[in-house]
Every structure is written in structure tokens, then in C-alpha cells.
């Protein structure tokens, strides 16, 4: 894939990431192939004489596909450009597992995001997990699963994590509809497995959150909840600048723009034939860019302003412009990294209304308390503490503002501005 550069430059990129404490997870499409895949091309050329007749599901030479093939086959959700692989065939499983071995040995990747994991056989996933444990014990397997009971996929025999689409839907509608009850219900329902799930507010298949929110001011409480509720929070590239984008009819182009790096860096990324690989040629991996999709320059002036993905690509504004939203997400990421309670801590609901929501994540004799307000008006809350404390106040880890604790009621008095949230560190005893 030329978008990743050459084998040498991609290995250099992975090595640089490891030097900076960053792990690299690549996308693996093991459910289906394209029509240009060697096995499918051979099947087209040799029909029932091809050694790959059993590589695909339900190959039938009694009828032809809508794309003019002289045979039929099972396609992914009726998309004939994507013929489905037959994972019951040991040759297919061996080929896919050898592919994983290659990417680990050649590039030292740290994990795979399994595309369409909900369509893969459990037997294949279990075999993949055994291989991962064998070749790299800390190798991370995350699956794209949209519907179903996530615990069926997330367990010691299967995957480490799957996409939490339930939270994705409830976290934005909780703000659009002023209904934190929906979000809290999903958190409680997924409590057992929730801390292992991959949480997000937008991705390459879903409209940008800046386009989905009816009120841009909700970006602040929404992202605060993303980083403090159970789960593994993620940011889709460009959304840290408030980029907008909606999925078009049979097109994801607006969701996957090319973000231009600052001009000097862009020049460093040019190959000898003028192609932008998205990877620096000097071995410095501190910055890189996507090399596909329409050009945009990301930037916003306030936390509540957003940037359209159809911005004129000839403007002088470059990617990487620091905005209040960018700074907030940086701060939230730093808080999440520094607080063990936010990694695997037990969840406890403390206060819930349609427009205000407070909960704690428990650590070792301490807790992180988050309170959010989706109303345009300020809210004055009396939030019960998760345990008794001798402290007289608690400090917001985002702003440094302090809030008083009432020793008589064991409640903390929190004044929340409209469309805001706080994260408080509280010590037990």
C-alpha cells in the first residue's frame, strides 16, 4: 500500500513510534478480498480448475455474478466487489495467519484492528488469538463489531476489545436530545465488559461528531465524558480540530480528507517522484499525514467552532493549528494517561438527570469524579461523594478550580457552567 510508503519507510515509522512510546495497530481485512486479489483473479481465469475454488464462500458455477463473472459467490452484504473468504478452509486460515506473522516479523506492529470482526467465524478468531499470544504476548486484537453482546467477542479466548457502537450512539444523542439517561443506561448495561471496549465519537464510517452535534458547545462535555467513562477512548484524526464531514451517498470521501502538514514538513515528505507518502523521509516520525482524499487545512478559533472538510485547499492555514478544542483534548488525554482509575477503575453513578450527570471511577483509595452539564445554563449540583474524605475541597484537573466539600452531608458543591464538565480527584480517608 503506497499510502504507507515503502517497506523500509514504514518499518522506520514503526521504530520511531516505539522510541516515543507509541504502539502501532494496523487495519486487517480478513473477512473478504477485492476482485483484484490473486486468488479471485485465478478463479476468474480457471473457474472450476482453479486451486482457489474453496477459498471463497458458496462458489457456484451454475450461475454468474451481477458483475459478469461466469460463477456466483457470496459477497459482503451484497457488495459484489467484496467476495467473502471461506474461513472453514485451512488454506485460507493458514494464509491469513502467515500474513499476521509477516507483519509482526517485518514491521514489528503491535496489534490489528479486525475489519468486520462480527462476520468472522469464532473458530478463526480463537486461532488468531492463540497465534497472537504466541508471537507477541502484548499483541492487541480489536474487532469492528456493531451489533450483538460484546462479551461474546471480548474474552481471553477471543479479542481484547471491540468497537463500542452502543456508546457511540448514546454519547452524542445524550447531548442532542438532552438525555443523559440513555448514556448512563448503556454504561450500566455494559459495566462488566465496558472498560475493555474501544470507545469513539466518530470514525471513518460515521459522520464527524462536529457535524452530528446540534450544538457545537457540546463538544466540551462530550469529549470529557469520552475520556472518563469506562472504555479505551480514541480520537479520529482531524476531529481534534473540530473538522466537519458527513457520509455521502455511497461515498466516504468527506469523512476521510487529506490533512496537509505545515509546508516545510510537506516538502520533507515528498519522494523523488513527487509523491506525498505521508511519512517523513528523514526518519523523524513526530509528524505524518494521510495521503488520500480531498485536501483540507484543519483549524478552529474556539472550542465550539468547527472546520468543514471541504475547505479551500489553497488557503495558507496549515494542519496542526492549536485551538481551544485541541488543547482540551490534549489535556483530557494527559489526565487519562496519568490516572489509573480511568483505565480499569470501577464505575459508580452518583447523580443523574436529563441534563446533568456525575459518576466516579474508583482507584486505590482514590477516585476520579466527573460531572457534566449539557444545558446552556449553569447548573449548581450537590454531588454525593463515593466515600468519606478528610479533604475540604477537590480540584478540577482540567482548569485547577477548587470546589468545597460539605463534611456534614459528605457532598461536594459543584457549579458547572453551561455546556461544560469537570474532572475532580478525590482521596479516601
Model-derived features: where do they sit?
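Substrate-binding/active-site clefts of carbohydrate-active enzymes
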Residues: 1-101, 105-106, 128-134, 151
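Substrate-binding cleft of secreted/luminal carbohydrate-active enzymes
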Residues: 230-244
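Structural preference for beta-strand elements that scaffold enzyme active sites
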Residues: 23-25, 111-113, 138-142, 196-199, ...
